[in-house]
C-alpha cells in the first residue's frame, strides 16, 4: 500500500484535532507496516477517547486509495453504528464508499452490501460478527480493523487468525 504523500497530507490536514505524539507514532508505524510485503498484525492500545479511531481511519484511507477494501469489525451493533458514522463523516470529502452491515439494516440492505463487498465495489464495510460469516466475502480485501477483539467468541477468533495470514490486521 503505497500512498501519494500529497493525498495523505491533505487528509491529515482535515483532522479537526491536534495529533498526540503517541498518535503520530502509531500512524507512522501502521503506515510503515502496511508497506511491508508481509501482512501487518498490529495492536493499537489506549484509553477510550485517545484517538485510536483516527489511527484506524488513516490506515483505512491508505488501504482504499491503494485500491483495496477494508472490513471494520465491532462486537456490538451500537459500536458498529458509531464506527460507521465516524468513518462516513471523516471520509465524506473523499470518493470513498462506507457501508454498514448490522442488525440495523433490512435483509435487502444486507444482501446489497454483501453483493457489493464481494464485487469489490464498496470500499469500507463496517459490521458486527456478520462480517466473518460464510455469506460475506470481499473482492479485494486489504485491511481488517478489529475493535475489542477480546469480546469475540472462539469460532470468530479462528476466522480472525486465518485472516491474519492473508491481509493486514489492525486491532484496537
Give the residues covered by each predicted segment.
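Conserved motor-coupling elements within RecA-like helicase/translocase cores
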Residues: 105-125, 135-139
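SF2 helicase catalytic motif II
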Residues: 132-171
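Walker A/P-loop
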Residues: 38-59, 70-74
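Loop/turn-to-beta-strand initiation segments
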Residues: 68-70, 97, 120-124, 140-142, ...
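Conserved helix-turn-beta segment of the N-terminal RecA-like "Helicase ATP-binding" lobe
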Residues: 79-116
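Conserved SF1/SF2 helicase motif Ia
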Residues: 59-84, 94-96
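Single conserved hydrophobic/aromatic residue that forms the stacking wall/gate
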Residues: 1-11
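Conserved pre-motif I regulatory segment
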Residues: 9-43
Amino acid at each position: 500500500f503505497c500512498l501519494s504523500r500529497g493525498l495523505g497530507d491533505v487528509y491529515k490536514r482535515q483532522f479537526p484535532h491536534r495529533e498526540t505524539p503517541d498518535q503520530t507514532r502509531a500512524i507512522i508505524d501502521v503506515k510503515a507496516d502496511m508497506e511491508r510485503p508481509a501482512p501487518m498484525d498490529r495492536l493499537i492500545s489506549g484509553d477510550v477517547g485517545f484517538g485510536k479511531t483516527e489511527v484506524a481511519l488513516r490506515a483505512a484511507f491508505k488501504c482504499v486509495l491503494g485500491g483495496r477494501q477494508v472490513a471494520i469489525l465491532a462486537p456490538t451493533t451500537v459500536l458498529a453504528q458509531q464506527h460507521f458514522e465516524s468513518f462516513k463523516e471523516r471520509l465524506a470529502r473523499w470518493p470513498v464508499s462506507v457501508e454498514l452491515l448490522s442488525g440495523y439494516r433490512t435483509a435487502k440492505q444486507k444482501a446489497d452490501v454483501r453483493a457489493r463487498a464481494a464485487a469489490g465495489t464498496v470500499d469500507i464495510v463496517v459490521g458486527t460478527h456478520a462480517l466473518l460469516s460464510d455469506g460475506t466475502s470481499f473482492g479485494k480485501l486489504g485491511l481488517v480493523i478489529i475493535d475489542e477483539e477480546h469480546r469475540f467468541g472462539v469460532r470468530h477468533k479462528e476466522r480472525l487468525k486465518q485472516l491474519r495470514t492473508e491481509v493486514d490486521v489492525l486491532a484496537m
